[in-house]
Amino acid sequence: MAEETQHNKLAAAKKKLKEYWQKNSPRVPAGANRNRKTNGSIPEKATSGGCQPPRDSATGFHREGPTSSATLKDLESPCQERAVVLDSRSVEISQLKNTIKSLKQQKKQVEHQLEEEKKANNKKQKAKRVLEVQIQTLNIQKEELNTDLYHMKRSLRYFEEKSKDLAVRLQHSLQRKGELESVLSNVMATQKKKANQLSSRSKARTEWKLEQSMREEALLKVQLTQLKESFQQVQLERDEYSEHLKGERARWQQRMRKMSQEICTLKKEKQQDMRRVEKLERSLSKLKNQMAEPLPPEPPAVPSEVELQHLRKELERVAGELQAQVKKNQRISLLNQRQEERIQEQEERLRKQEERIQEQHKSLQQLAKPQSVFEEPNNENKNALQLEQQVKELQEKLGEEHLEAASQQNQQLTAQLSLMALPGEGHGEHLDSEGEEAPQPMPSVPEDLESREAMSSFMDHLKEKADLSELVKKELCFIHHWRDRRHQKTHHLLSEPGGCAKDAALGGGHHQAGAQGGDEGEAAGAAADGIAAYSNYNNGHRKFLAAAHNPADEPGPGAPAPQELGAADKHGDLREVSLTSSAQGEAREDPLLDKPTAQPIVQDHKEHPGLGSNCCVPLFCWAWLPRRRR
């Protein structure tokens, strides 16, 4: 652009210069041209200023006479005209020189302006390039900002949705909190009522209950010490087994090293045998070629039979070595094949075990959390709850390697504690286990079985799992034994008051107690009342299970009619019958039986049918018996 403007300016300056020259160019007058044509050589003479030398003028004057003056006049006029023309031309030349100087100055100015314009254009181009680069960077920054804005909008939407979800959850939790608070208030009200009822009992009954609770506390302490001793024994066995596993691990590592060394030696022997076979094949081919070559026409000497026999023996020996080597290679290949088959079988077993443990891990994740119970324990069953807590801690320490056995143990403990708890509380504590088999977590099977460390760690892990499962089984056996001992002790305590328990169970508790005197009669009557109440409690438990098996509208096959329940309420002075009937009514009307929390009770009754029909009376239920009226 700058060059084009410069060329245009130069062209305009040239045009102006041409116009100026055309305007100021000198024009010769027409009279002067005529004088040049008519006079011939007269203008040449006039070049000397129109003056002739005196010699010529004198000669002319003398020669021509009167005509010389006329010619002189005629010559003076063009000379004067030419002088005027020359003066005008000199003036024009000076003017032209001035104009040329002015034009040169203008040209210099124009060139200087062009250079300045070039510099300005270069600066503008540089600035333009810088601006283009800045525009590109701004566009890139704009795109980045747009992407950041898009991501920020997405994250904002995500956080808004999350906040909405959290608000909904908070609302549900608040609702649940209100429900739980209402349930807790109801429970507290029932507990207050029960406390008021218990406060109306006699002082002797409370003292007797305290004695019984102290006995139970002593028994539970003994059992707790036994559990601690068993736990210490289990820890010692675990340490011994860990040492045994370390020795087994070292032995397995040594065996793996030996196997790897044997494999390396077999590979080396195989390579050496292959080389020997190649050498023998080459020697055999050479011997065959030597035997196949035709005899020369004139042999220098016929080979003897001894040499031929020697060659045959050599050939047979080479063939025998070759066959032996082939057989050896076949045996090595068979050994390698068998070893590969064994490794594949081990991998298949490990894969099946991995799948089994993965299935168990999936079922473990489906377990539900235990249902929280909002009942404050009384002074009588605090020790039992502490025992349950210690058993849970022991179960957590043993781990979740065999959760099926641990769940059975927990169910048995909760059943025992529910038998030991007060039957009037209605609900009792139970775990909300959803169910099914609880698999042990799957150990990750190492893919690279050839690595010694992975194989040894995998075998160590499997043995630890087996050890833990055995420990859980031993703990279950111990708990079963403890449960049987508890039943025997309760039977023994029931049979202590002098053989009156049987008659009292049949309904004669009041009369038998009246026959005796003092505290013995009171204890016997309490035992009779406890047996009758517990029999009614067992009947109510069976009815509850029957109602759980059957629908809510249909009564169970062994469930009595409501009239029978009302009659049972009127029989005697026992309040526990009304509690069992109310428990049955709740079992029929309660919609929670359709929920998973009521299913483990029915499942426990199916798996252990002896729990509902056991006639042992827990000692804590005597604390709930009404005072016998004398």
From Swiss-Prot:
Coiled-coil ranges (or none): 86-148, 224-411
UniProt biased composition (Basic and acidic residues): 352-362
GO CC terms of this entry: cis-Golgi network; Golgi cis cisterna; Golgi cisterna membrane
Keywords attached to this entry: Coiled coil
Cross-referenced InterPro entries: GM130_C, GOLGA_cons_dom, Golgin_A
GO biological process, one term: Golgi organization
Stretch list, region Disordered: 1-76, 352-379, 424-444
Family, similarity comment: Belongs to the GOLGA8 family.
Protein name, UniProt field: Golgin subfamily A member 8K
